[in-house]
C-alpha cells in the first residue's frame, strides 16, 4: 500500500546515508532487486524499485545482484535487472554473484535449459549475463561454489581475468628525448580500457583521487619530479576506445643529467613534489 512504499523509501534513504556517513573510504554496495525493500521477495517488479536503486546510488552506493544465471521471470535475473544494469553501466560498478548453488539447487529446471549434472552450464550462463551487464567484479562465493568455478569452468575464470573489470593501459606515449634545463615538457599519451567494466574513479569514496601522472626518475630510481595531467580522467575510458591527451609540464628545474620518464596512474597525495 501507499504507506509501505513511503516507509520503504524513508528507511532506505536513512540507512544508506548512515552507512555513507561512516564508511567514507570504501565502496558501498546494494542489491538491485525488483522488489527492493518490499515485504515480498519475488513477483513482478515493484514500480518504485527503480527509483529506490537510484536513491541508494545517489547516496554513494554501487550495485550488485546475486541472481545471475537465474532466468525465472519471478525471482531470477530477467528483463528488469538487465535494464537496471544497462541504465547504470559505466556510472557505478556492477558486481555479480550467481544465483544457483549447484550442489543443492535444481538448476536444471531453469528456463535456460541447463543440463542436470552439468554445473558448467550454469557457470556459462552466469558468465554470459555478466559480460552483458559489463560487471566490474565476479563474486564466486565460497567453498564448493568457488571450487566449481575453478574445476568446472576454469576457462571462464581465465577469460574474466583477461577481459573483465577494467584493463587500463597506455598504448602510446610521446615525450622528447632531450629537454633544456628550465624548459617545459610536452607529454602526449593515448589510453585504452580493454575490460568490460570501467575504472570507478568517480565513486564518492574515491572522489577522482587517481590521476595520470608523468614522472622523471633519477639513477637511484627515485622520482625527482611528478607532474599530473588534470585533463586525463580514467573513469571515462570504456569499450576499448582510444582516449588521447596532451599536456605541458611546468618548467623542469632539475640538474642536468639522465632521467627516465615514467607515465602511470597513481594517487598523487602519496607523492612528494607534485606539480600541476
Locations of regions flagged by a protein language model:
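Catalytic-core regions of glycoside hydrolase
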Residues: 3-144
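Catalytic cores of secreted or luminal carbohydrate-active enzymes
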Residues: 125-175
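Structural beta-strand segments of beta-rich domains
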Residues: 183-187
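Short, acidic/polar linear motifs in exposed loop/turn regions
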Residues: 193-197, 220, 251-253
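Short coil-to-beta strand junction motifs in C2/discoidin
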Residues: 200-213
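A beta-strand/beta-hairpin structural motif
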Residues: 224-253
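A short tyrosine-centered beta-strand micro-motif
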Residues: 254-263
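Single conserved hydrophobic/aromatic residue that forms the stacking wall/gate
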Residues: 264-276
